């Protein structure tokens, strides 16, 4: 009797663990995607600033 209840509790725990792991993985992927987007935005800003500086250097006031 105790063995069957033990196995069911273990299977329930493993199912919960799998759900938690999947949730953590999805959150990790979302955070990585947001970081990549932030880095890409920073790179585009830096590129635009570099172009502006180049134009300003080519055409000084």
From Swiss-Prot:
Keywords annotated in UniProt: Glycoprotein, Host cell membrane, Host endoplasmic reticulum, Host membrane, Host-virus interaction, Membrane, Transmembrane, Transmembrane helix, Viral immunoevasion
Lumenal side: 1-14
The keyword rRNA-binding is assigned to this record: no
Transmembrane segment boundaries: 15-35
CC annotations in GO: host cell endoplasmic reticulum membrane; host cell plasma membrane; membrane
Superkingdom to which the source organism belongs: Viruses
Residue positions with a glycan: 3, 6, 12
PTM entry text: Only 1 of 3 three potential glycosylation sites is glycosylated. Oligosaccharides are not processed from high mannose to the complex type because the protein is retained in the endoplasmic reticulum.
Compartments, as annotated in UniProt: Host endoplasmic reticulum membrane; Host cell membrane
ATP-binding listed as a keyword: no
Chain ranges on the Cytoplasmic side, renumbered to this chain: 36-61
Signal peptide bounds: none
Record's bilayer topology term: Single-pass membrane protein
Membership in a protein family: Belongs to the adenoviridae E3-CR1 family.
Described purpose of this protein according to its UniProt entry: Prevents infected cell apoptosis induced by the host immune system. May act by down-regulating host TRAIL receptors. May act in complex with E3 RID alpha and beta. May play a role on cellular apoptosis regulation in the ER.
Complex formation: Interacts with E3 RID alpha and E3 RID beta.
Protein name, UniProt field: Early 3 Conserved Region 1-alpha protein
Lineage: Viruses, Varidnaviria, Bamfordvirae, Preplasmiviricota, Tectiliviricetes
